[in-house]
Amino acid sequence: MSAAISFGVLTSPAPPWQQVVDNWQRIEELGLDSVWVPDHFVNLRDPSLPQLEAWTLLPALASQTTRIRVGSLVSAIPFRNPAFLARQALTVDHISQGRMELGLGTGAAGSMDASYAMAGIEDWSFAERVARFQEVVEIIDQLLSNEVSSYDGQFYKLQETQMSPRPLQR
């Protein structure tokens, strides 16, 4: 069995908005398979540069394209509650008509990402980030696979969490 190679591009989420839209539409016209935005509170190289927020951009940009797959590269788990992240991904999946790609990551160490200090996000140890990542993946998988989910982990707990509508893709 062979799989086709796909090509995508990570784009800048810097304003102005219309330039971001034009870039995504041009990428789609060029025939690339996916387009991504980084999920950080600020630009990693220069926090003073303007930057729009990834999960607000994704549904807006998905509505401005028709074929290309869309996603965040990657969503760092310290920035979001896993149930809300699953709901955000589900919403983008519907707005994009099934073109959502969910990229997840443990998050960089706070010393490498000014987002933590600037937004008051706790900088977990590497071991804790990895352990939390495992729980987040399990939770999101459960939520997107079942109409009702419960989870009792070391870091996260869900009680009869309902997830409707169902994702368009799986």
Predicted regions and their residues:
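Short, flexible active-site-adjacent loop segments at beta-strand->alpha-helix junctions, enriched
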Residues: F41, A76, T106-G110, F155, ...
